[in-house]
Regions:
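Hydrophobic alpha-helical transmembrane segments
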Residues: 6-11, 82-86
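Membrane-embedded catalytic scaffold of the fatty acid hydroxylase/desaturase
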Residues: 17-134
């Protein structure tokens, strides 16, 4: 693959992951997967939540794509774009974790934005959490 194709694949995957996250949150986490997601909407002092298992699902998706793209794993059957799709999923997971768990829920650091887009993002998420039930 050319460098431009690699970059476009990583960026396209990153962007596509926003749709995957939105739709899985709406239809899975607040649907049949509510059992894992419920504790994310309830106050607690635990370091981890069942909801964190969804992060592991994302990690498995990324690792699987890395494996599909790896000649070390699949030999001549490796599909090179898999590596770059896996990287796009990985980058999305890192950004999502830093923004959602770090900035919004302050699990890793304490910083409350006073203005701008970051403040609006935190406010919108708090409004989402104000909803009781699924």
């Amino acid at each position: 693959m050319s460098l431009i194709a690699i970059i476009l694949t990583v960026v396209a995957t990153f962007i596509a992951m926003e749709f995957v996250a939105w739709s899985s949150h709406k239809y899975i986490m607040h649907g049949w997967g509510w059992g894992w997601h419920r504790d994310h909407h309830e106050p607690h002092d635990n370091a981890f939540e069942k909801n964190d298992l969804y992060g592991l699902v994302g990690a498995v998706m990324s690792i699987s794509m890395f494996a599909i793209g790896s000649p070390l794993v699949l030999g001549a059957s490796a599909w090179q774009p898999g590596t770059w799709i896996g990287l796009g999923i990985l980058f999305y997971g890192i950004v999502y974790t830093l923004i959602h768990d770090g900035l919004i829920h302050q699990r890793y650091f304490r910083w409350v934005p006073k203005r701008g887009y970051a403040k609006r993002l935190v406010q919108a998420h708090k409004l989402h959490h104000a909803t009781i039930g699924k």
